[in-house]
C-alpha cells in the first residue's frame, strides 16, 4: 500500500473526528469521535513503523499502549456519562451543568 494513501486516510479520519468532537452535543458521540481521533493516530504510528522501521516494532508497541489507554478512557467516559444520565436524565453536553444541582 502506498504511504500517501494511508496518510490521506488517516488525515480524513482525524478530520472527521475533530469535526464531530467540535459539533457534537451528545456526550456518547463526542466519546466516539475522540476514539476516531485516537485510531487515526494509531494508523499513523503503525504506517510509519512499517514503512521506515520494519525491523523494530516501536510504532506497533506504542500503538498497543494507545489502544489500552483508549479502552480505559472509553470505559471511564461511559461510566461518567451513565452517572450523568441517571442524575440528569440527559446526556446532551449543553444541558448538563455539573456545578448546579
From Swiss-Prot:
It is a multi-pass membrane protein. GO terms for molecular function: oxidoreductase activity, acting on NAD(P)H, quinone or similar compound as acceptor; quinone binding. Its EC number is 7.1.1.-. Keywords: Chloroplast, Membrane, NAD, NADP, Plastid, Plastoquinone, Quinone, Thylakoid, Translocase, Transmembrane, Transmembrane helix, Transport. It comes from the Eukaryota. Gene3D superfamilies: 1.10.287.3510. One of its GO terms (cellular component) is NADH dehydrogenase complex. It is an enzyme of class 7 (translocase). Its main location: plastid. It is found in: Plastid, Chloroplast thylakoid membrane. The chain crosses the membrane at residues 2-22, 32-52, 61-81. The keyword Iron does not apply. It catalyses: a plastoquinone + NADH + (n+1) H(+)(in) = a plastoquinol + NAD(+) + n H(+)(out); a plastoquinone + NADPH + (n+1) H(+)(in) = a plastoquinol + NADP(+) + n H(+)(out). GO terms for biological process: ATP synthesis coupled electron transport; photosynthesis, light reaction. NDH is composed of at least 16 different subunits, 5 of which are encoded in the nucleus. Belongs to the complex I subunit 4L family. NDH shuttles electrons from NAD(P)H:plastoquinone, via FMN and iron-sulfur (Fe-S) centers, to quinones in the photosynthetic chain and possibly in a chloroplast respiratory chain. The immediate electron acceptor for the enzyme in this species is believed to be plastoquinone. Couples the redox reaction to proton translocation, and thus conserves the redox energy in a proton gradient. NCBIfam families: PRK05715.1-2 (NF004320), PRK05715.1-4 (NF004322), PRK05715.1-5 (NF004323). This is NAD(P)H-quinone oxidoreductase subunit 4L, chloroplastic. It comes from Oenothera argillicola. The gene is ndhE.
Amino acid at each position: 500500500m502506498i504511504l500517501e494513501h494511508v496518510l490521506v486516510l488517516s488525515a480524513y479520519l482525524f478530520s472527521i473526528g475533530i469535526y464531530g468532537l467540535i459539533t457534537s452535543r451528545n456526550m456518547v458521540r463526542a466519546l466516539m469521535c475522540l476514539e476516531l481521533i485516537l485510531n487515526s493516530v494509531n494508523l499513523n504510528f503503525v504506517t510509519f513503523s512499517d514503512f521506515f522501521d520494519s525491523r523494530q516494532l516501536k510504532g506497533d508497541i506504542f500503538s498497543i499502549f494507545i489502544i489500552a489507554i483508549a479502552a480505559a478512557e472509553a470505559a471511564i467516559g461511559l461510566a461518567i456519562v451513565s452517572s450523568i444520565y441517571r442524575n440528569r436524565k440527559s446526556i446532551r453536553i449543553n444541558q448538563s451543568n455539573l456545578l448546579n444541582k
